[in-house]
UniProtKB/Swiss-Prot annotation:
Cell location: Cytoplasm
Name by which UniProt lists this protein: tRNA (guanine-N(1)-)-methyltransferase
Single GO term (MF): tRNA (guanine(37)-N1)-methyltransferase activity
SUPFAM superfamilies reported for this sequence: alpha/beta knot
């Protein structure tokens, strides 16, 4: 079985693997369940200063990452990771969701282009059939943090990463899971009473039918309150 391999293009290579070198993702990296390489875009920069950006045609604030620089960096990435799907974290992109992760994993070879400054030249997106992907309706300083978040989400779905793969079915947003794409129910552990707050008695009853019904109703109520657009099947 092929492993997940990510090639990351960035002007800040020291940001990787970052949090992906720890916890579940870090253990999976050591087990060779996934792998990565990082390409410094500045290695393909122009002049002795290794410039990677320039002023925007048509005016406007901010600098744009140059297509000639990015093109050379992407060509190098494709030589290391052939047939890879290329993703560009961008607020203009398709919103990243749990169901999207399964679509992305159909190709285990991925390239992430981490933009900086005002963004990248549109011709790069057209030339390499780059898919823009958004992690939410807010603006970050660059694509590195979204790339880390997306990879973390992908890695934990790989076989052998979680000790109990069945836990995936009881998580929020899992359309085929226990909560049918809704939000996870409230969670409790020991002690039974903490600062006057008791664990719901149904969870202590040992009646699995009642417990499952309670969990589903909790999920429905929480989803209705916080994310009503997810209620289609609840």
């Amino acid at each position: 079985m092929s492993i997940l391999h990510a090639t990351i293009l960035t002007v800040f290579p020291e940001m990787f693997p970052g949090t992906l070198g720890d916890s579940l993702a870090g253990q999976a990296l050591k087990k060779n369940i996934w792998s990565y390489d990082v390409i410094n875009i500045r290695d393909f920069g122009l002049t002795k200063h290794k410039n990677v950006d320039d002023e925007a045609y048509g005016g406007g604030d901010g600098l744009i990452m140059r297509p000639d620089v990015l093109g050379n960096a992407i060509e190098h990435a494709l030589s290391l990771n052939p047939n890879a799907s290329i993703y560009y974290p961008s607020p203009r992109g398709r919103v990243f969701t749990q169901s999207f992760t399964k679509e992305m994993l159909k190709n285990k070879n991925l390239i992430f282009l981490c933009g900086r400054y005002e963004g990248i030249d549109e011709r790069v997106i057209e030339e390499y059939n780059v898919e823009e992907i958004s992690v939410g309706d807010y603006i970050l300083s660059g694509g590195e943090i979204p790339t880390l978040a997306i990879l973390d989400c992908l890695i934990r779905l790989l076989p052998g990463v979680l000790m109990n793969q069945n836990t995936l079915s009881s998580e929020s947003f899992e359309e085929d899971g226990e909560f049918k794409g809704g939000l996870e129910c409230s969670l409790y552990t020991r002690p039974k009473i903490w600062r006057g707050r008791a664990v719901p008695s149904v969870l202590l009853s040992g009646n699995h039918k009642l417990i499952n019904e309670w969990k589903k109703e909790q999920s429905r109520m929480i989803t209705k309150l916080r994310r009503p657009e997810l209620l289609k099947d609840l």
